[in-house]
Amino acid sequence: MKLARRLSVVEPSPTLAVSAKAAKLKAAGVDVVNMANNHALDYGPKGMQDTFNAIASSKLPVVGIGHNAAEAYRPYRTVIHGQRIAIFGALDWLEPALIPAWSATDTQPGVAMSIDRTRLVAAVRAVRPEVDTLVVFLHWGTEETYCASPEQQDLARTLLAAGADIVVGSHAHRVFGAGKVGTALVAYGLGNFVYWREDGESGRSGVLLVTATGREVDTYSWVPARITNGVPVPETGGPAAADVTEWQRRRTCSGLAP
């Protein structure tokens, strides 16, 4: 999704949001948004500039896009209960023909990419000594699957080796399982959240809750929901328990431990 109003369309699709939505997200309590996704430049450079303007006026912190590479690969930083936290955002899935025009470079606005891992890995390594907990949020994976590909698993391990403590992602429109790789946490897919489809697997949603102390992930859990009229509604009782059990089961095919 992008926050724009000009309609110089690269890819006709229902991915345009009015700029006021940025302020609404901030008012709702959203701390930071990963804007690196495969629709970020559907409306071209003018649409991206409108997105920058909307972000600036709302003061909503975002990661994963920027006026240049330094900005796009810059993490959001905050301190919670004395713990220094950094959150990166990047895109790992895009049609190859679009990559040059969409990638943030030293002289070009655009999206942070992990397709070429070099810059993202370097950014993670550079920030690692300065924070207690480091999170990377990726837009990645194959749509309508719920098992991580070998490429995803390799990228997750690469980022963990570079210093990430938590790797989280989305894009497949499916809820993946989550689990440990060593002492780190990986959640390959959080599914849909606010979305127009609500049937079957597309309607499976939820919130991943994680507590961490420094580099140690203390607890993690899944609060399941079902999308109803476009928004997630928390589940209760038997349906909630069944969805949590399925979420736990799905970690196995992605090579994750409890």
Question: Where are the model-predicted features located?
Answer:
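Conserved N-terminal helix/loop that builds the PLP phosphate-binding region
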Residues: 1-28
